UniProtKB/Swiss-Prot annotation:
Family, as annotated: Belongs to the ABC1 family. UbiB subfamily.
Chain's gene name: ubiB
Chain ranges passing through the membrane: 24-44, 493-513, 515-535
EC number: 2.7.-.-
CDD domains: UbiB
Protein kinase domain sequence ranges: 126-494
Example of a GO cellular component annotation carried by this entry: plasma membrane
Protein name: Probable protein kinase UbiB
Bilayer topology term: Multi-pass membrane protein
Entry binding sites for ATP: 132-140, 154
Pathway: Cofactor biosynthesis; ubiquinone biosynthesis [regulation]
Gene Ontology molecular function: any one: ATP binding
Keywords, ordered alphabetically: ATP-binding, Cell inner membrane, Cell membrane, Kinase, Membrane, Nucleotide-binding, Transferase, Transmembrane, Transmembrane helix, Ubiquinone biosynthesis
Active-site residues (renumbered): 289 (proton acceptor)
């Protein structure tokens, strides 16, 4: 094992030298003296050298490709962190392709039989040995079940965990060294990024997780004209094997075929936006790997086109609070209400509470005003979020993994939509959806539902408060004093409930203000009830 680690280290060193990645480190102006002096000990730096023909981003991309699948996938993850990376490097890393030679089909057959506990011929009436596709984590074979259904069988690449563990160890080592060596590197939080990648890559190795994600997404879009998700055959799914319905559609980037079948491209682009916002705001569960290779278009109704989504290994979700703040942020942003945007970032806890609103507002205005000089159809929604996050990072915004996934997905959807229909006005498509969603959240039905959910917790709240007070009570508290202390606990619980109602009413009223609409009667009812519970004796 140690010999393999040494060989891997030498391999990494050769790639660093070949693409002169040492320049990326030594161009940093704030290196410690001892590290800056190391360049003198690198023999290749004393040799004559030609001017570098490739940019730093291109050299980094080629180096990651040379280092293999694990580094390629890490580069793909890095490309989504546009809030942290320089634009030229992020653009280059977007070009990384996760394509590797297929592994021996006999290994795939052996793994399937081991996982299913049956021979391939006993499960499938046909199994294509030649894979349909091969990537760093798994490869896919076509097959037919004994019952006649056409399926695809996804199989995890054998012997992958030791390779991943070894490469992750080197990535962590490089990240820690970079953090110690450079102030700029520390700002990028490389150790945190590698940690996120570690979780993502190990999640992708568990195909039962992917099957569960696909099953959830399919249920969310059951009967929808917007998107179709293939059926999962749960009785044939295992941690290293996934069996799904085989779909036949047109790759979303095959513009010629889409045109030949007279696909309504405008509707297709707009439905892509609707799919995104439906997942994020209605379901709070979104496919977070919607690059063109994972999206197809049904051939059934080209005049009413439907998307087909595959590969649900990476998904994201938002809390109700994040959904609410995100919707308000976007609406306020397009109203150019920068103070509201700044205040929402602080209220949500995305930036520290001590942040000066005026300074944050000015920074947002400086970054965002130039964007609005363009026509709305030319404004990139994803770029807006990216610039917003970049600005917030300067004010110590904590990394929000769910928002990073959201921004990456939005950039993919937006880029795809404009490729399908260049005049796509994403904001005009999204605004009615957001405003409708906000109105539904303030509707009497939604408010009553929230109150009902809170009411279920009331008995427990009083008991918890009373228990807390009793634990904090004096050791000499006698039995005669306990009833009074219990009464005080009940009163405190009611005051807490009142505070919650006040907060809920204020949130509803604020939502009405965001939409320039009158506050609904439930908001006033909640405010009045909350005030009564707080001031009552």
């Amino acid at each position: 094992m140690k010999l393999l680690a040494v060989r891997r280290l030498l391999r990494i060193q050769r790639v660093v030298i070949r693409y002169r990645l040492d320049d990326l480190l030594f161009e940093q102006p704030l290196l410690p003296w001892w590290l800056a002096s190391l360049r003198l000990l690198m023999p290749w730096r004393w040799l004559p050298r030609k001017p570098l023909a490739l940019s730093r981003g291109a050299r980094l991309r080629l180096a990651l490709q040379d280092l293999g699948p694990i580094f390629i996938k890490f580069g793909q993850l890095l490309s989504t962190r546009r809030d942290l990376l320089p634009t030229d490097i992020a653009d280059e890393l977007m070009l990384l392709q996760d394509r590797v030679p297929p592994f021996d089909p006999q290994h795939a057959v052996a793994l399937i039989e081991e996982q299913l506990g049956a021979k391939v011929g006993e499960v499938f009436s046909r199994f294509d040995v030649e894979p349909l596709a091969s990537a760093s984590v798994a490869q896919v074979h076509a097959a037919r079940l004994k019952s006649g259904e056409e399926v695809v069988v996804k199989v995890v690449r054998p012997g992958l965990k030791p390779v991943i563990a070894q490469d992750l160890a080197w990535l962590f080592l490089i990240a820690k060294a970079a953090e110690r060596a450079s102030a700029d590197a520390r700002r990028l939080h490389p150790v945190e990024i590698v940690g996120d990648y570690e979780k993502t890559i190990y999640d992708e190795l568990d195909l039962l997780r992917e099957a569960a994600n696909a099953s959830q997404l399919r249920r969310n879009f059951e009967g929808s004209e917007l998107m179709y998700v293939p059926q999962v055959y749960w009785d044939l799914c295992r941690p290293k094997v996934l069996v799904m319905e085989r779909i036949y559609g047109v790759p979303v980037t095959d513009m010629a075929t889409l045109a030949d079948q007279r696909t309504d491209m405008k509707m297709l682009a707009e439905r892509g936006v609707e799919v995104f916002f439906t997942q994020v705001f209605r379901d709070s569960f979104f496919h977070a790997d919607m690059h063109p290779g994972n999206i197809f278009v049904s051939t059934v109704k080209p005049w009413s086109p439907q998307y087909i989504a595959i590969d649900c290994g990476i998904v994201g979700s938002l809390t109700a609070e994040d959904q609410d703040y995100l919707a308000r942020n976007l609406i306020a942003f397009f109203k150019r209400d920068y103070r509201r945007v700044a205040q929402l970032h602080i209220d949500s806890g995305w930036v520290p509470a001590q942040t000066k609103v005026n300074e944050f507002e000015a920074a947002i205005r400086t970054v965002c005003e130039p964007i609005f000089e363009k026509p709305l159809k030319d404004i990139s929604f994803g770029q807006v979020l990216m610039r917003l996050f970049q600005t917030a990072r300067r004010f110590n915004m904590e990394v929000q993994p769910q928002l990073v996934l959201l921004q990456k997905t939005l950039l993919n959807i937006e880029g795809l939509g404009r490729q399908l229909y260049p005049d796509l006005d994403l904001w005009s498509t999204a605004k009615p959806f957001l405003e409708r969603w906000m109105r539904e959240r303030m509707s009497p039905k939604a408010v009553i539902g929230n109150l009902y959910n809170q009411a279920e917790q009331l008995p427990h709240l009083a008991d918890m408060t009373r228990d807390l007070l009793e634990r904090l009570s004096q050791p000499h508290l006698n039995d005669a004093q306990l009833p009074e202390r219990r009464r005080q606990g009940d009163n405190w619980a009611l005051r807490l409930l009142g505070a919650g109602l006040l907060g809920g009413g204020a949130t509803l009223a604020a939502g009405a203000v965001s939409l320039s609409a009158p506050a609904a009667w439930p908001a006033w009812l909640m405010l009045a009830a909350g005030l009564y519970l707080i001031v009552r004796r």
